[in-house]
């Protein structure tokens, strides 16, 4: 339930806010696409943590590049 709400918030950002801003993300996939994938793959808690970590790295002094969402690791 929370995961869906967070994904919806990111989708709203992608549709309404992002088109008004110049492209600035230094990574592929974009930070918002990364957030959606992280939330869908890892759930609300870990997906949010991965998204915050990614957003903290997205600044002019970081080289950027390809940064995919980590795969799920099986529980032992």
Curated annotation (Swiss-Prot):
GO cellular component terms listed in the entry, alphabetical order: plasma membrane
Keyword match Protease: no
Topology of the protein relative to the lipid bilayer: Peripheral membrane protein
Localization in the cell: Cell inner membrane
Predominant location category: membrane
Keywords, ordered alphabetically: Cell inner membrane, Cell membrane, Membrane
Family annotation (SMART domains): Haemolytic
Transmembrane intervals: none
Any single Pfam family the record assigns to this protein: YidD
InterPro entries listed in its UniProt record: Membr_insert_effic_factor_YidD
Family, as annotated: Belongs to the UPF0161 family.
Biological role: Could be involved in insertion of integral membrane proteins into the membrane.
Protein name stated in the entry: Putative membrane protein insertion efficiency factor
Organism: Anaeromyxobacter dehalogenans (strain 2CP-C)
Upper classification of the organism: Bacteria, Pseudomonadati, Myxococcota, Myxococcia, Myxococcales
């Amino acid at each position: 339930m929370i995961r869906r709400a967070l994904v919806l918030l990111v989708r709203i950002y992608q549709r309404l806010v992002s088109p008004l801003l110049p492209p600035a993300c230094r990574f592929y996939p974009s930070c918002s696409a990364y957030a959606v994938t992280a939330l869908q793959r890892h759930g609300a808690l870990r997906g949010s943590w991965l998204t915050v970590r990614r957003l903290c790295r997205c600044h002019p002094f970081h080289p950027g590049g390809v940064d995919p969402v980590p795969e799920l690791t099986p529980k032992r």
